């Protein structure tokens, strides 16, 4: 359901990715687990048909698809797995026009600022970012901070600010609650 709404928003907002309109996005990169690449492609076809926008899905090696996306205005959307992103990021950073929007499905995979995958997005330098996840907090609040910082860099200035304002009070309240239960 959310993917349908997202695709609808992309098309309405970007007027079929028209490069002549101010504030539109010419190229979109969708990064997801490899098992979801075909599903994303199917959803685009289901809701937009085959000819409304150019969609490429990387299911195998992907070199040809990445080159087509990077060097052609014919394709506006590239769907690829997280693993393929790491091997393609340098080529993707040279896309003409540049990638204007990145969508990360199962975005909780970006749980640390120091992972190779998370650092790939720094190379792309895309300002517009959407992160989709059903589990934003898996282990600790630092992972949540990383995801928020990915979508809105600098919102909390630094992790130390986030920790002082949010994480520490939450952890203290949890500790107090636990001690009351165990008395």
List PLM regions with ranges.
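ASCE P-loop NTPase motor core, strongest for the SF2 helicase catalytic module
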Residues: 3-174, 181
